[in-house]
UniProtKB/Swiss-Prot annotation:
Gene3D superfamilies according to UniProt: 1.20.5.1300, Nitrogenase molybdenum iron protein domain
Binding site for NAD(+): Y125, Q186, N209
Pfam families: Histidinol_dh
InterPro entries named among the record's database cross-references: Ald_DH/histidinol_DH, Histidinol_DH_CS, Histidinol_DH_monofunct, Hstdl_DH
UniProt protein name: Histidinol dehydrogenase
PROSITE patterns in UniProt: HISOL_DEHYDROGENASE
Organism: Leptospira interrogans serogroup Icterohaemorrhagiae serovar Lai (strain 56601)
Lineage, highest ranks first: Bacteria, Pseudomonadati, Spirochaetota, Spirochaetia, Leptospirales
EC number: 1.1.1.23
Length: 427
C-alpha cells in the first residue's frame, strides 16, 4: 500500500486528529535513558565519552575529539566546494537582512533603548546516521557568525574514527572554530558541560534524533544550556490546486520521505483529480527511483496522507492547525494565499519552489521547528543567537515628575519603604 487518499472536512476528527498530534511524542522514556548518559559525561568527561562513542557509534574513538579548523586543509571535489561556497553566500546574504538595529526612544524626557548582544559560545549539532549534512553546518554557523558569536564549534558523530572532508570544508567555509567528533546524547553533554579536552558552550542548536533532542531538552531544563526548538521528524505539507503538476508534487512528498521512516509528507488539495494523479506518481516514482526505497515506502505508508477538502480555505485552516515545518503552496494565486499562513517553519511559494531549494541553496534556513512547534517557534536565524538588552537613562526632571506615580504603585505593592524611597531621595 502506498499513500492513501481521504476525502475530509475539518470536523472529521477521527482522521485528522491523529495527524495533528503526529510527532508530539512523550520524551519521558527517552529522557530516562539519556539522563544517566548525560550525568556520566558530566562526571567522568572524556573517559565516559570514549566509552559511549565506541558503544553507540560503533567506532574506535578518535585520539582527540577536537579538530581545530584553522589547522585543517580538507581535499574535496571542486564542484562540491563551488556548491558549498555558493550556498554559504546565499545563506549569508539572506541572513544579513535579519541583523537588528539598536534603537532609542525618548519618553517623558528619559532615554530608553535596546542593545542587541550575542551569545558568547555556541555548538551546532550536525547529525550522523544515514546521511551527511554539510548544509546543516552552513545553516547553523553562518547566522551565529553574523550575530557576532565569537566561539563556534560543530559537534557531530565520528565516521570510522574521523570525519569526511566535505564536513570539514563546510565548517571552514562557514567560519566555525573547531569540530568536536562526538554524537548523540553523549556529544550534547560533552559540549554542554565541557570535558578535559572539549570547551563548553552556552547554547546548542541543530537537528538530531530523539536522543539528541532529549539531551538538549534535559540540559536546557537544568539551566546548563540554551537551545533552539526541540526537533522531531522532518515534515512537509503541500497545499495544491489543479494548477499544480502532479509529478512535481509527488517528488516533493518523496523528498521528505527520503529523510527517514518517521518523516511526514502530506498533500492538502481541493482537487480529487490531482489527488489521484499524485498517488499514481508516488507509486510510479517508488519503482523508478529505488534508492532508499524501503525507507521511503515505510514513511509514505505510515506518515503519508492525501487530504481532499471541499475548498482551499479548509486546506489552510488545517495547515495552520498542523503548523508544518515546511509548507509548499502550489496554487494559482500563491502570493495572495501566503497571507493565509499563520503557522509554518518555512514557506515555499509556487510550482518552482521545492523544499530542496531551501534545504541547500536558496538562502533561507533549514533548521526549522517541527511537530507543531512552528506555532510558537521560528526558523533558526540571526536573532536566535542574540540577546535583547534594554537600557534607560533617567533625568532628574523625570524623577520629579514621575515620582508620584512610583509612590502610588510601590505603596500598592507594599514596597514603598525601599523601592519608593530609592526614587524619593533623588527628587
Amino acid at each position: 500500500m502506498a499513500i492513501q487518499i481521504f476525502k475530509v472536512g475539518l470536523k472529521d476528527h477521527s482522521v485528522l486528529d491523529p495527524v495533528l498530534k503526529r510527532a508530539r511524542e512523550d520524551l519521558s522514556s527517552t529522557l530516562a535513558l539519556v539522563k544517566p548518559i548525560v550525568e556520566d559525561v558530566k562526571n567522568r568527561g572524556d573517559s565516559a565519552l570514549r566509552e559511549y562513542t565506541q558503544k553507540f557509534d560503533e567506532v574506535i574513538p578518535p585520539k582527540s575529539f577536537v579538530l581545530e579548523i584553522s589547522k585543517l586543509n580538507p581535499k574535496i571535489d571542486p564542484k562540491l566546494k563551488t556548491a558549498l561556497v555558493k550556498a554559504a553566500k546565499n545563506i549569508r546574504n539572506f541572513h544579513k537582512i535579519q541583523i537588528p538595529e539598536n534603537k532609542e526612544i525618548i519618553i517623558h524626557g528619559n532615554k530608553l533603548g535596546i542593545l542587541h548582544t550575542p551569545i558568547e559560545s555556541v555548538s551546532v549539532y550536525a547529525p550522523g546516521g544515514k546521511a551527511l549534512y554539510p548544509s546543516t553546518i552552513l545553516m547553523g554557523v553562518i547566522p551565529a557568525k553574523l550575530a557576532g558569536v565569537k566561539n563556534i564549534q560543530i559537534v557531530t558523530p565520528p565516521r570510522k574514527g574521523t570525519l569526511p572532508d566535505g564536513l570539514i570544508a563546510a565548517a571552514k567555509i562557514a567560519g566555525a572554530d573547531r569540530i568536536v567528533m562526538a554524537g548523540g546524547a553523549q556529544g550534547i553533554a560533552a559540549v554542554s558541560y565541557g570535558t578535559e579536552s572539549i570547551p563548553s558552550s552556552e547554547f546548542v542548536v541543530g537537528p538530531g534524533n530523539k536522543f539528541v533532542t532529549a539531551a538538549k531538552v534535559y540540559l536546557s531544563g537544568q539551566g546548563v544550556i540554551g537551545i533552539d526548538s526541540p526537533a522531531g521528524p522532518s515534515e512537509v505539507l503541500i497545499i495544491a490546486d489543479d494548477s499544480a503538476d502532479p509529478m512535481w508534487v509527488a517528488a516533493d512528498l518523496l523528498s521528505q520521505a527520503e529523510h527517514g521512516e518517521d518523516s511526514v509528507a502530506i498533500l492538502c488539495t481541493n482537487s480529487l483529480s490531482l489527488a489521484q494523479k499524485v498517488k499514481e506518481e508516488v507509486e510510479k516514482a517508488l519503482i523508478e527511483r529505488p534508492k532508499r526505497g524501503e525507507m521511503k515506502r515505510k514513511s509514505i505508508k505510515d506518515h503519508g496522507k492525501i487530504f481532499v477538502f471541499s475548498n482551499l480555505e479548509e486546506c489552510f485552516v488545517f495547515s495552520n492547525l498542523f503548523a508544518p515545518e515546511h509548507l509548499e503552496i502550489q496554487t494559482k494565486n500563491f502570493k495572495k494565499d501566503l497571507k493565509k499562513v499563520k503557522h509554518a517553519g518555512s514557506v515555499f511559494l509556487g510550482n518552482y519552489s521545492p523544499v530542496a531549494m531551501g534545504d541547500y541553496i536558496s538562502g533561507t534556513n533549514h533548521i526549522l521547528p517541527t511537530a507543531g512547534a512552528a506555532r510558537i517557534y521560528s526558523s533558526l536565524g540571526v536573532s536566535t543567537f542574540l540577546k535583547r538588552v534594554t537600557w534607560q537613562e533617567v533625568s532628574k526632571k523625570s524623577i520629579q515628575n514621575l515620582y508620584p506615580h512610583v509612590k502610588v504603585l510601590s505603596e500598592f505593592e507594599g514596597l514603598d519603604e525601599e523601592h519608593g524611597n530609592s526614587v524619593r531621595i533623588r527628587r
